[in-house]
Amino acid sequence: MKQIWMILVSLVLMTFTGPGGFAAETAKTSLEALQAAFNGESNANAKYLAFANKADEDGYAGVASLFRAAAKAEEVHLTNHAAVIRRMGAEPKADIKTPEVKNTMENLQAAQKGEIYERDEMYPAFIKLAQQEKNSDAQKTFRFALAAEGGHARLYGEALNNLENDKIAKEFMVCPVCGYTAVTLTGSACPVCATPAEKFIKIK
């Protein structure tokens, strides 16, 4: 009986574990959500840098640039999350897992899946928690991340569709304030946070 109970607990934990190795859906407060998001973004940053190295090895320069740009965006997000955590009197904590690196196509698929999860499930739930607590700082950092993750999911999808025809951009631009990521900017400022275009970080 005890063995069966342990198996059930393990299955529940697996169900609630997000792509960064954290139990995002178990967060009950905005602080817990911030810690989960910080952990997730920290793991995503490490994972995308590893994926970039593999893409370089596989000869996909554009995909490598995309992964590096996404890693920089996740760095922006984890920095923003950490700042709010500290303002709430806590210290950010991350459990960095060794990334599982496969071939570049599989890495793109895994990355897109993680971004879709954050876009459709994780960050909307975290924003709701922050709204319930009227935590405006948490709402802001979550909304910044949500906007960027949606863009990352789209960019990964485009990269998958163009993986073999070499039509993937070799340079990307990342907003240093919200992490918005794009190949080019259509205006003079970030469409998410209004940071001037000249402050964007160029990633190759």
Language model: regions and residue ranges:
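Positively charged n-region of N-terminal signal peptides that target proteins for export
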Residues: M1-I4
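Bacterial N-terminal signal peptides
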Residues: I7-T17
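Non-heme di-metal
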Residues: F22-K204
